């Protein structure tokens, strides 16, 4: 045991302890009871919701209504896979959210260390903890429409930052678009679209720090925008069709 402790760094022990603490909070909260942060059927029967949400028109007791939830389909496919593994709705919810919070903290860690050369791994770890353990995340993160985009925001900004470092690359703009796609288009992607505004302060700060040319910035923004638009067509087209 002592040899093992000697081989494991204090950073690894701290990180492992924090992950364990997060797991206790997520999995131990309301143990044995199912809670949801969106329509219950999303966790109860996600596979049946996929077909329903792929249509621009949804049935209801009042002759139906326009469907603006096509953007939720990627999430439904993931949840269907978890349910297919035999997880109950309660554990599907908890496993999904545990993964979300790990992704969020890891992304915040990576983003801070990439944006600030002097940031140590401990600074990155603190950034990840603070990104999760703050009043806004605790309160607003109770709804999936906010929690999912928020978890992926650091990764989207990290891809943007890397794209600015390598203006000729298409890989990082593609990663930017994929991060936006993974946020899903639920609620007509209102939250992810607002989060795109975060790119403005990032480029204003980094342009001066890295002496970037506006032409290079414009090229990266255009490529990121093209991928975002292209990967959003699956919910944009049905949403426009639902309007009329």
Task: Tell me the role of every PLM-derived stretch.
Residues 3-10, 64-65, 106-111:
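Short alpha-helical segments and helix-capping/turn motifs at coil-helix boundaries
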Residues 7-12, 90, 94-97, 117-121, ...:
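Membrane-water interface of alpha-helical transmembrane segments
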Residues 85-88, 166-167, 210:
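Short coil/turn helix-boundary motifs
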